[in-house]
Each structure stands twice: as structure tokens, then as C-alpha cells.
């Protein structure tokens, strides 16, 4: 056998082996990297869907929280792993803003959306001992005492930062942002009186609201939600950005083999359709989306466009969306 034929045979065997490996996926346990810390909305959603995906895949998904850098730590970590589908990124919306905020160049365009599980409802919650009964009361206090009211934050690109920036484009809101490593620690600080208010995903705080440990003074919507007043009632101008909210999804590197992507997509579609998961999501104030592939990519691009240009308008973007090729909404 000459060298050319030998090379062709070896290449064919390698390709066949790769296809067989992809079709047999998964052959061992998977790693699920959660973008934010324990107790936050992303963590809650990830830990709810993982057992159902394990059942569909027939293998364990070992979960680990790897927070930091507004999601950049986990995103970079997963991007550095082999393109075999065994490392999943269980993340939220944050990487879509890393470019405009100067955090990094890695966003979800470099990843395949296995499943956008759902999107959240945003509420503005306050320490239960504060006198505010509405967002109007909170805003009046903020404007009367510039820099004295403390807002819990998760850093640039996090949900509180994005919502605060949106509000800041339509009214003056001179607060002091106090950063935490995820919604969970921020909400703990809120209950302890270390910060005064915090915009969060309802999924992260519904139990605290129901138990009276914090009070919800507005929902980022044009319609009330379960007795929580719509923010547009006190701030009509915010309506131009609505509907808007965080989202939660499962991602792998874009160059993972197609057969592996298909296997993961099917498994998580089944998991996200499970009535127990749907009930948990809805019960925590989330809308189930359960989309993947091209449909999910279109959603991600639209969300990035709306939010990146909002940050540009608010004057907090470090880089122009136009320079990053992000089209105006």
C-alpha cells in the first residue's frame, strides 16, 4: 500500500471513529458549569433542569458553580475545554454584553445554544424595613439623596446593572451600586440591610417575597404581576424597552460535532418539557421558552441588540455596539 492510500485509509478510519464516538455520546458523565453562584436564579434553573436531562441522556451531569467576572470566568473556562460536548455552560444573558462593557470578546456567537430554557420576569425588591411602598417612593428618595441609596448589583453586564442603566436613560437615578458575586449573596445582603434595593429575576427571589423577607415594589413590565405593580405605572417612559428580561440556557462550544449537538438538544428539549420543570419555572415567575438552534440564535441576537444599544444610550458602554457589528434594534 503506497503512502497516499495508507493516508486515505487512516483518515477514513479516524473519521469513522469520530462519528461512532459522537453517535455513542455520552459514554461518561458530563460537567455542567453554572455561570453564577449558589442561590441565584441561574443556579436554581440549572439545578432544576439537570436531573431531567440526566434521565434523558442516561449519564450524570456533575454541576459546579464557577462565578466571577459577570459570567466571563465560566464562559472562558468552557471555551477552553475540548470540543466534545462533555462540558456544558449553564448560563444567563451576561456574555451578550461583555463586548460593549469591555469585559471580553467572547459572547454566545462562539457557542451553540443547546436550549434557551426560559426568560425571567424582573422585579425591583427592597429591604422590608424601608418605608417605600412604590417605585415612585424609592425614586423620590434616590433623587433627594444622591448617592446615599445603595443598590445591590452583580457587576457590569449583570441584570441589576442593565436594569439600572435602562432606568437611567429615562430619569435620574444616582445610586451607589454595591457589587456581589451573584444574586444569591446580593439578596442575603438586602435582607440584612447592607443594601437598600435590588433589581432581580423573580425566579431568584419569589420565596423571599412570599415569606415577607423582602418586599417587591415594581415589576419590569407594562402589566402587574401577581399583585406587584407594573413599573410603567410610575415610570411610563421605560415602556420603550419592554418586554425585556433575563434568560437562562444551556450551551456548548460551536464546533462540537453535529451528532453530539443533536443528542444534547433532544435531551434538553425533553427535560425542558417535563411538567415538573415547567411548574417550577412558572411558579418562580419565568416563561418557558425551550428553543434551540437557529431559533435560539435569532433570539440571542435580538436580545443583544436591544440591550447593548440601551447601554450605549445610557452612556455606560465601553465600546460602541456599532464597532462590534451589533445592529441597532
Where are these regions (language model features)?
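N-terminal export leaders
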Residues: 3-9
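An extracytoplasmic/periplasmic, membrane-proximal ligand-sensing/linker region
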Residues: 27-29, 210, 262-329
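Residue-level signal for nonpolar/aromatic packing positions in well-ordered secondary structure
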Residues: 30, 39, 46, 63, ...
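Hinge/capping helix and adjacent helix->loop/strand transition within the periplasmic-binding protein
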Residues: 53, 77-86, 99-185, 231, ...
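Solvent-exposed coil/turn segments that connect beta secondary-structure elements
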Residues: 93-95, 119, 129, 202-203, ...
Amino acid at each position: 500500500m503506497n503512502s497516499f492510500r495508507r493516508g486515505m485509509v487512516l483518515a477514513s478510519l479516524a473519521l469513522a471513529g469520530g462519528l461512532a464516538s459522537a453517535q455513542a455520546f455520552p459514554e461518561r458523565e458530563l460537567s455542567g458549569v453554572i455561570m453564577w453562584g449558589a442561590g441565584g436564579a441561574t443556579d436554581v434553573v440549572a439545578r432544576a433542569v439537570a436531573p431531567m436531562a440526566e434521565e434523558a441522556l442516561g449519564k450524570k451531569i456533575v454541576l459546579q458553580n464557577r462565578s466571577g467576572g459577570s459570567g466571563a470566568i465560566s464562559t472562558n473556562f468552557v471555551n477552553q475545554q475540548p470540543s466534545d460536548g462533555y462540558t456544558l455552560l449553564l448560563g444567563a444573558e451576561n456574555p451578550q454584553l461583555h463586548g460593549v462593557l469591555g469585559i471580553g470578546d467572547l459572547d454566545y456567537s462562539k457557542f451553540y445554544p443547546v436550549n434557551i430554557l426560559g426568560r425571567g420576569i424582573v422585579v425591583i425588591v427592597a429591604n422590608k424595613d424601608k418605608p417605600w411602598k412604590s417605585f415612585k417612593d424609592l425614586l423620590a428618595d434616590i433623587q433627594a439623596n444622591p448617592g446615599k441609596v445603595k443598590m445591590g448589583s452583580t457587576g457590569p453586564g449583570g441584570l441589576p446593572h442593565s436594569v439600572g442603566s435602562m432606568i437611567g436613560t429615562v430619569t435620574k437615578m444616582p445610586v451607589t451600586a454595591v457589587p456581589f458575586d451573584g444574586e444569591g449573596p446580593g439578596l442575603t445582603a438586602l435582607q440584612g440591610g447592607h443594601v437598600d434595593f435590588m433589581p432581580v429575576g423573580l425566579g431568584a427571589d419569589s420565596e423571599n417575597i412570599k415569606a415577607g423577607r423582602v418586599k417587591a415594589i415594581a415589576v419590569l413590565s407594562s402589566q402587574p404581576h401577581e399583585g406587584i405593580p407594573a413599573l410603567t405605572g410610575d415610570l411610563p417612559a421605560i415602556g420603550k424597552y419592554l418586554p425585556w428580561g433575563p434568560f437562562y440556557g444551556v450551551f456548548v462550544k460551536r464546533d462540537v460535532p453535529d451528532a453530539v449537538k443533536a443528542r444534547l438538544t433532544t435531551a434538553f428539549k425533553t427535560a425542558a418539557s417535563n411538567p415538573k420543570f415547567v411548574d417550577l419555572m412558572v411558579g418562580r415567575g419565568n416563561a418557558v421558552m425551550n428553543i434551540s438552534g437557529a431559533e435560539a440564535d435569532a433570539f440571542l441576537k435580538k436580545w443583544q441588540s436591544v440591550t447593548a444599544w440601551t447601554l450605549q444610550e445610557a452612556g455606560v458602554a465601553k465600546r460602541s455596539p456599532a464597532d462590534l457589528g451589533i445592529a441597532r434594534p
